[in-house]
Amino acid sequence: MSSTLPATKSLFSILLPYWRSKEKWGAWSLLGLLVVLLLIRTGLQVVFLISGGERTSALAAQESDRFYQATLIFAAILIISVPFASVTDYIRAKLSLYWRTWLTHNYLGQYLSNQAFYQLRLKGDIDNPDQRIEEDIRTLTKESLQLFVIALESSFQLIGFAGLLWSISQPLMVFLLVYSVVGSAIAFFCFGRPLIRINAEQLKQEADFRYDLARIRENTEAIALYRGESQELSQSWQQFGHVFKNYTHLIRWQLGLNLFQNHYRYVTYIIPGILLAPQLFAGNLEIGDITQAGAAFTLTLSALALIVLQLQQLTSLGAAIRRLQQLTAAFPKNAELSSAPHAITLRSGPSLVIKNLSLTTPDGQKQLIKDLSLSLSAGESLLIMGPSGVGKSSLLRAIAGLWQTGQGSITYPQQSTYIPQKPYLPPSSFRSILLYPHANTPAEISSELAGTSSVLSTTIKTAQLQKILEQVNLPSLCNHPLDSPLTQPLSLGEQQRLAFARILLRPPQYVILDEATSALDLTNETNLYQQLKRSNITPISIGHRPSLKTHHQQLLTLTANGNWKYSRILH
C-alpha cells in the first residue's frame, strides 16, 4: 500500500503551502472556528446521549418526574444542535472554497508561465492537466476538509465516549479496540491499493472523454464539411467504452468494499447486547445503560474504524493527490529544460542573431538544422522556404523559445511577436481579441489604453480601429461593438487578416509569420505585407509561394539532412 499512496513529503507539498501563505491567518482562523464548533457539537452529543439513556431508564422505571426532566434536557440539546451542524458545514464549505481558490491560482500560475502548458503538451507525460487543475483540486480541498472534520470529530467522540463506554463495560471496550484494528488492516491492505489506482484511472478516462467531446465542438465546421459524423460517433463511443469498462471495474471493487463495510458495521449491532445482557439480567445495569452503551459503542467504533468507514473517500482523495503531485513535479522539469546540457541558449537583444544552431526532433533521432548562423537587423526581412518536414516551423519555434531540442544560441528581438497559420482568437470581447495578449481584463485594458500607446478607448481610437480594419480588408467588422464577442465564425482568411490588424494596432519591431497568409489571395497577401512595411515592421516568414519573395530581402532555404543555404533576394 505504501507504494501506491502518495509519499508523505509529496502529500505535505500539496496540502501545506496554503496554510503557510499570505492568506494563512484567515485560513487558520476559519479552521480554529471549525475546531471550536466541532468541540461544542461533540459535547452536546455526549449530553444528548446521556439524557437519552436517562429517558429510557425513567420510562422503564415508570418515574415521571425523572422522565420529563430528561426529556426537557433532551429537547433543549436537540434544538441547540441543529444550527451548530448547519454552521459547521457552512464554515467547512467556505474554507474549502478559499483553499481551492488559492490552489487554483497557484497551479494556473505555474501552468501558464515559462510555457509550461506548451512543454507539457509537447512531452505528453501528463494527461489532462486541465482536468487536474479543475476537478482534482476541487476533490482535494473538498474531501480533505470533509475527512478532517470527520477525523477531528471522531477524535473528540473517542475522548467523550470511550470513557463512558469503559465505565459501563470494559470487555466491550477491549472488543471494540481489537475489532477496529483488525477491520482497518483488512480495509487498508485489501481494498485501498486497487481503489486508488482505479479511481485515478477513472479520472483520466472521464477527462479523455470530455476532451474528445470538446474537440468536436471546436471543429464543428471541418467535421460537417467532411461529413465525418459517423467517424466521430465511433471514436467518441469508443472513448466512452474505456470509461464504461473502468467504471465497471470500479463499482465491482466498491461492491466488495460496501459488502465488507456493511458486514463490519452490522455485526456491531448485536455485540453490545450480547456482552451486556448478563449484567442487565444480574441487576447491575439499567435498561438506559444498555441504550447509552450501544450508542457510545457505535460512535466510538466510528472514531476508531475511520479507515474502514471512509475508505472510498480516502481513495478518491489519494487519487487526486497523486495526480496533482505528478503535475507539480512536471512543472520544474519543464522549466529547467533551458538549463539542460546541449540546450539552446536564448537571450534578448536589439536584432535577430543565430549562432551555430542545430535542431533535432524531440527524440533526437533526426537532424533538422545543422550549424546555422545568421544575423538580421531591423528592416532586413527574411523568408524561410523548403520542402515540408525539413524544420521550417521548428526554426521559428526555436526563435520563439518553444523548441529546445538542439544546441546553439539565439538572440531574439525584444520587440517581436508571432502569428501562426491559424491565429488564436480567445473567447472574449472584440476588444480583447484585438489587444490579445496585452490586456486581459477591463481594468487592465483601461489602464493600458490610458498611456501614450493607447487605442480603442475613445472615439478617436475607435476611428483608428476602423481605419486599420479597412487596411486589412475587414470592413464588415468596423462597426462591431468592441465589448461584445464575435457572433459569427470567421473564415481562416478573415482570421489571418484580423491577426495582422492586431499587429498594426500595436506595431512590434519584428513579426514572425508561420504561413500566416496561406488562406489569402495574392492581392490580400501583397496588401498585408505593404502594411507591415509602412509600419516599419520587419517580417520573418515561412511560406511556399514564390510570390512571397517579392516582400523579402533575405532567403533561407532549408533542405534535407539539416543542410541550408542563405542568400539575398534580387528584385
Q: What is the role of each PLM region?
A:
Residues V36, V47-L49, V149-G192, K245-Q292, ...:
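A hydrophobic transmembrane-helix motif
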Residues S2-L16, L97-T141, D208-L213, R217-N246, ...:
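Extended non-transmembrane interhelical loops and adjacent amphipathic helices
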